[in-house]
Every structure is written in C-alpha cells, then in structure tokens.
Amino acid sequence: DSEGVRYEEPKLKMMGIEAVKSSTPAPCRTMIKDGLKIMMNGTEEEVIDYIDNCRTKFKALPPEEIAFPRTVSNVKKYHSRTDIYSKGTPIHARGALLFNYYIKKNKLDKKYSLISNGEKIKFIYLKKPNIIQENVVSFIQDFPRELNLDKYIDYDLQFEKSFLEPLKAILDAIGWNVEKTVNLELFFT
C-alpha cells in the first residue's frame, strides 16, 4: 500500500542508499535494485550467484558506464605550481587535474575540453603501477583512450566501491555473505 493505493506488484521505496544515488554509476544502481529484490525473495546462495554474474557483466562494460559521476568544483584551488595537484585534493578533483595535465601534455585539447569548475565529470580508479603513476583519472564524457590508460582501469576496485560495498552493508545486517565461504565444518560432513 502507498497511502491507500494498492499496487499489482509491491513497490519498494528506497531512500539514501546507493541504488538511488546519482553518484553511483547507472548500471550499478540497476544491479543493486535487482540484488535487493533477490535478498527479499531469494536465498543467500541466489544472492551470491547474482553477485558473481554482476561481476562478470561489470568487467565487460566500457569505462564511461562504470565511472563515478560527480560535479567538480575548486579545480583551480587544488592546482599546484610544483606538482599537478596539492595535498588533500579530493579524488575526483585530483582526477580532473590529472586529466587536464595529460590532455595538454599530449596535445589533445582540440579533441577533449579541459575540465573546469562546476563541470559534470566521471572518475575511474586505475591500477598502479601505470604510465601516469596515479590511481585515478577523471573525464567529461568520453574516456581519453589516447592516454593508453584503458588497460590500467581497476575494474575490481570500481566493482567493490560502486556495487559490492553498498550491498555488503545490507548483507552484513542480515548475516549473509557476498561470496561462498569455506569453513571447517564442510570437511567433516
């Protein structure tokens, strides 16, 4: 029921969780919502299988779809004269400053606009070591493949932060695991 109106299929009202936050990548929002439905109607085993399937699908998605959307402000404030960014720079702003630096350095500023204050951007985690020796890069709409960073995208960390952590908070509360666990009892049964 919703204020006296009965729905064919019960509607789940979600507030404050990653399934509805605009700062969560869109495919993850859908996967989290579906995961919550399985949690309410299925078994722990079904949830674990669902998470494994989501991990496989996630790793096949392009960077533009799995990156975290944010609005960046104070890009100039965090710029450093000696380094690319100053200490304490938020991760998405650090990614923006790195993007601007490497786009200029590689003379790609005709193809990609530089990121400025108030811009809607996306940021993605990178594995280290990599060619820029940083763990993040931001971009506006299209991932800059010319920087050759595609092979360094940390799909595992992206999946962990955008999908697994939000689900794990709920699974922990109900005492379920996110993956199959082996315990000693299995050896004695």
Question: What is the role of each PLM region?
Answer:
Residues D1-T189:
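DNA-dependent DNA polymerase catalytic subunits
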